[in-house]
C-alpha cells in the first residue's frame, strides 16, 4: 500500500522525548537503537504494537542541537489519526498535561487539534470518522478507544509546490484530492499515512534543521523491486539524485532531496522491528547493527541513561 512509511525528526533530551511520546501521547516504544551514521546518538522509534509502516515516528536525540526553524523547504506539521469522537478527550488531556496546543479547527472537513512537542516540533491530531475500528496500541496512559491510530499525514511548506506535486502524483502514487486555503492535499490511501499536503509560501523565510524539526519523510515500498522502480521513476522523470540502497536493519532505504528541498526516503516494509527482539519486548534493550556490536561498551558509555522498562 503506498503512503508514508515513517517520519524521522530531531529531539533534544532522549528521556524527555520518551516520556512525552509514550506517556502523554500513548505510543508504543518499539526500538531503542543508535543513529547508524552517528552511533553516539540515540535513534528512538515509536509506533503501534509492532511498528507497522504508517505508524512509526522516529527521533535522532541530539541533546545539544540548536533549535530548528520552521520555513520553506521543511515539513511544517506532522499529523496523527484519532477517532473523531476523541477530540474532546485529547483537548482535556493536553490541558491536564501542560501540552502547548491551539483550538480545534476545521481543515478539509476534518477536526484538527494542533500541538507542539517539548522540543518545538509542530504536530496535530486529526479526528477521522471510522478510525475507532482501526487497531491501536493499548498503553497504560491513554484509553484504547482514544488512542492514536498512526499517521494522518504531513504538511510541507514550499516556495513552489508544482514540482513536488508532480513527483508525488507521478512517482510516489499519490493523487491530488483537494485545495483549501492555499493548501493542496494529496492522498495515497484512505488509511494511516495516506496524506501529504503542500502549503505554498513564496518568498517566505527558509527553514533550518535542528531540535523540533523533521529530518526526513519516508514513503513505503513493498519490497526491493518496488523501491528500485519508485526511485528510478523519481530520478529519470523528476531529476532527483538518489543514494544507493542503505541497510537500516529494520527496512532498506533510498534517499533523495525532492525539488522543494525536503529530504525524502523510500523504505521497504520488511523486515520490520521484530527482526532482533520479540514483539512482546520491543524497545526494552539497546539494539545495535552487527557492524557496531564490537563497539557496544564504548557506545553505551557515551549514551545518556534512558530507562524504558515498564
Predicted regions and their residues:
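N-terminal beta-strand motif that seeds the catalytic metal site of vicinal oxygen chelate
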Residues: 1-16, 75-82, 130-165, 208-220, ...
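Surface-exposed interaction/gating patches
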Residues: 145-232, 236-242, 246, 258
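Conserved donor-binding loop and adjoining core beta-sheet/short helix segment
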Residues: 31-36, 46-80
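Core segments of cupin and vicinal oxygen chelate
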Residues: 9-53, 96, 104-114, 156-199, ...
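Vicinal oxygen chelate
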Residues: 2-12, 33, 63-159, 179-199, 238-310, ...
